[in-house]
Amino acid sequence: MPRLFFFHLLGVCLLLNQFSRAVADSWMEEVIKLCGRELVRAQIAICGMSTWSKRSLSQEDAPQTPRPVAEIVPSFINKDTETINMMSEFVANLPQELKLTLSEMQPALPQLQQHVPVLKDSSLLFEEFKKLIRNRQSEAADSSPSELKYLGLDTHSRKKRQLYSALANKCCHVGCTKRSLARFC
């Protein structure tokens, strides 16, 4: 008798779960028209909800198939094990390396001095230094930071901001779905 009761209770729970999923899907497709603070508050509320997930953002609800363990373990862990194995081999050979005397391992002072650049013409270096300062000042006058520009990092953040501002304009003037706001979480 208790098994039958638990079986019926399980069925009711599954039905309620399906109903809440249908309500959540229709809630995510609800069109809202908000501007300014109200839009930001709605975005925070949508992103802060614990009930939505990346799976609810996708249109299709494909069942998840279990993946093999090799796919779950990231590849960098395998690379780390290779590095650890190589380091352990190195440590095993370390006593042979320590047999070298300190004088053999350190180069002499004249050998080090040949790598130090000699300042022959200080006025020429001063002119190059002034040109470098002028170039830096002209780069600072540019609208974007030079370091980010050369690294290519500013384009991604600019594109992301432009996409979000376009979505904000659309939400303010036309309206947008909560699902489209949730994509920016």
From Swiss-Prot:
Keyword annotations: Cleavage on pair of basic residues, Disulfide bond, Hormone, Pyrrolidone carboxylic acid, Secreted, Signal
Tissue specificity field: Isoform 1 is expressed in the ovary during pregnancy. Also expressed in placenta, decidua and prostate. Isoform 2 is relatively abundant in placenta. It is in much lower abundance in the prostate gland. Not detected in the ovary.
Places the protein is found: Secreted
Family annotation (PROSITE patterns): INSULIN (PS00262)
Signal peptide: 1-24
Pyrrolidone carboxylic acid sites (modified residues): 162
Pfam families membership: Insulin
One GO location term (cellular component): extracellular region
Domain of life: Eukaryota
Quaternary structure note: Heterodimer of a B chain and an A chain linked by two disulfide bonds.
Physiological role: Relaxin is an ovarian hormone that acts with estrogen to produce dilatation of the birth canal in many mammals. May be involved in remodeling of connective tissues during pregnancy, promoting growth of pubic ligaments and ripening of the cervix.
Protein name from the UniProt record: Prorelaxin H2
